[in-house]
Design a protein with these regions (language model features):
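Cytoplasmic-side transmembrane-helix entry/capping segments in multi-pass membrane proteins
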Residues: 1, 48-61, 83-84, 108-118
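Hydrophobic/aromatic residues within transmembrane alpha-helices
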Residues: 16, 42-45, 49, 104, ...
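Short helix-capping/hinge motifs at transmembrane helix termini and TM-loop junctions
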Residues: 44-45, 67-74, 105, 133-137
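Hydrophobic alpha-helical transmembrane segments of multi-pass membrane transport proteins
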Residues: 1-19, 38-39, 65-66, 85-100, ...
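Membrane-helix interface residues
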Residues: 20, 46-49, 108-109, 170-172
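Short alpha-helical transmembrane interface motifs in multi-pass membrane proteins
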Residues: 24, 52-56, 81-86, 144-149
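Hydrophobic transmembrane alpha-helices of multi-pass small-molecule transport proteins
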Residues: 31, 38-39, 51-71, 124
């Protein structure tokens, strides 16, 4: 399930970028802690939030909605509400992945195995989804593009996710 949610998050991000800006997607993607706090407190008693944490969470959510309000109204800056809603869904999928790991025995799996599983599921499902959608595949690589992909793979998709999985295994998710 964690691998499917992980793949779905990235599929959602791809679709989102066709309907809103990368900066708006980033903000909505990082609503993941909201979803974790809302859902994990129901499933794991040790993850309960104190009243002041709930107040802070609500204030942060209202601030995000206020900052991005022009995309929610007709005639707003490009009317990006569809993309914003999908971005919120991508954030929810990331949150659900975290909840799935933290609230199950998956939290005992080593970070590198968890990352491998999630990437393996994505590596199979996302190209199949791309083919099913009739996406054109262009392979024009430059040295810069190759180096950029290598940096993103090693740092963005390996080191950062290993650290995240390690943190989930050692600390309450609502405290990270």
């Amino acid at each position: 399930l964690a691998g499917v949610l992980f793949a779905a998050e990235f599929a959602a991000m791809y679709v989102v970028l066709q309907h809103t800006t990368a900066s708006r997607l980033t903000v909505f993607l990082y609503t993941s802690p909201f979803w974790v706090a809302l859902l994990l407190t129901l499933l794991v008693p040790a993850e309960r939030l104190r009243r002041v944490q709930w107040v802070g969470l609500i204030c942060a959510f209202v601030a995000v909605a206020f900052a991005l309000r022009e995309g929610f109204v007709q005639g707003g800056a490009g009317v990006t509400w569809r993309g914003d809603l999908l971005g919120l869904a991508a954030g929810a999928l990331w949150g659900l992945t975290t909840v799935t790991i933290r609230a199950s025995r998956l939290v005992q799996v080593s970070p590198e195995k968890m990352l491998f599983y999630q990437v393996a599921v994505s590596a199979v499902t996302l190209p199949l989804l791309s083919a099913a959608l009739g996406e054109p595949w262009h392979w024009q690589w430059s040295a810069f593009a190759g180096a950029s992909i290598a940096v993103q793979t090693v740092i963005g998709a390996f080191v950062s996710y290993l650290v995240w999985m390690w943190l989930l295994a050692h600390y309450p998710a609502t405290k990270i």
